[in-house]
Amino acid sequence: MEIKVIKEEQNYLELQIDGEEHTIGNLLKGMLLKVPGVKFAAYSLPHPLITSITIKILTDGSISAREALIKAIELAENYANLFIDEVKKI
């Protein structure tokens, strides 16, 4: 996995993630939309034969786009840990 910043402003971040496809794209988009202050989050897979996605994040300015991404990743980690705990109970 390699992450490249395509464009960054205070409330906007566009990243290219090489070596990843829909799995991480859907996860990040879903978690980003749960972060307060995020107005828009989306990802695209430019071509099905290329394993690279582009993620776009736009916030209302109350949080930076980079901070929103970090919070979304932390949220995903919390969900994963909760899921692990529930599976262990089975």
Swiss-Prot record:
Gene3D superfamilies for this protein: RNA polymerase, RBP11-like subunit
GO CC terms of this entry: cytoplasm; DNA-directed RNA polymerase complex
Major site of localization recorded for this protein: cytoplasm
Pfam families documented for this protein: RNA_pol_L_2
EC numbers: 2.7.7.6
Gene Ontology annotations of biological process type: DNA-templated transcription
Any GO MF annotation of the entry: DNA binding
Keywords (A to Z) from UniProt: Cytoplasm, DNA-directed RNA polymerase, Nucleotidyltransferase, Transcription, Transferase
InterPro entries linked to this entry: RBP11-like, RBP11-like_dimer, RNA_pol_Rpb11_13-16kDa_CS, Rpo11-like
Presence of the UniProt keyword Transferase in the record: yes
Localisation per UniProt entry: Cytoplasm
Quaternary assembly: Part of the 13-subunit RNA polymerase complex.
Job of this protein: DNA-dependent RNA polymerase (RNAP) catalyzes the transcription of DNA into RNA using the four ribonucleoside triphosphates as substrates.
Similarity annotation: Belongs to the archaeal Rpo11/eukaryotic RPB11/RPC19 RNA polymerase subunit family.
Name recorded for this polypeptide: DNA-directed RNA polymerase subunit Rpo11
